[in-house]
Amino acid sequence: LCIVAGILFVSQVNASENNGKDDVKYAALTQKDIDALPVEKRASVLDELGFIHEYGIGVPMNREQALQYYKQACELGGNYGCYNVKYAYQYGDGVAKDSAQANKYAKKMNLDNLLIEQEYIDKFSQEIYMAKALADTDKSQRAAFISILIHALNNRPESDALFFSRIGFNQEKTFRLATLWSQDGDPQMDYQMGRLTLNDFSGRYADEPYQARPASLKWFRAAAEKGVVEAQSLLGGIYSGG
């Protein structure tokens, strides 16, 4: 079960079909609109605003603004944003590096219902954030980062999904981020998009899971045509097996 952070302001819409419209809707919210929301939904909306501004999804990229949204989200119960702020201060993303601030916000994360000890929270978050930092500074590392997220998020129990959501990652966000990055034409990202589609990280095929496989083939074919060996092997296995 995936914990999906993007809760719409008016009504919940299929994110895989309406992301662009939703991003515009979020970006148009005023602080007054946000303040009028119930606390949990407000935190989720602020987290979503942080996400789209962090990566420039439907809005201009603005890491400084993203950090402010994440900070606000973190202060509303610790379910969202706290580890995003930790990352920013730890790696100097949109702000000067500050280990004290990084630790301060990490401690604000809500630990309720997390079936994982602090030692492993630190270990797993650090591994993912190291990969994220590489992807943030080197486009050639983006596909590897998405692959790590697929491994972390695919077919996990609810408790694991909750943990990864608390530190800033879920299936829907991973799909949206990979979709954005796939526009650069990286063959390896085409392959990762095939994996994401096959495993329905978008949630689009929840009611029709049999549609995910054919939808993924266009990505695998694109990757194979560009020389990605893993995609070529996968398609070879599919075609040889009928």
Ranges and model annotations:
Residues 39, 57-61, 75, 91-97, ...:
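Short coil/turn and helix-start
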Residues 43-44, 79-81, 187-189, 229-231:
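Helix-start (N-cap) detector for alpha-helical repeat units in TPR-like alpha-solenoids
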Residues 46-55, 84-91, 130, 162-167, ...:
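Hydrophobic face of amphipathic alpha-helices that form TPR/SEL1-like repeat modules
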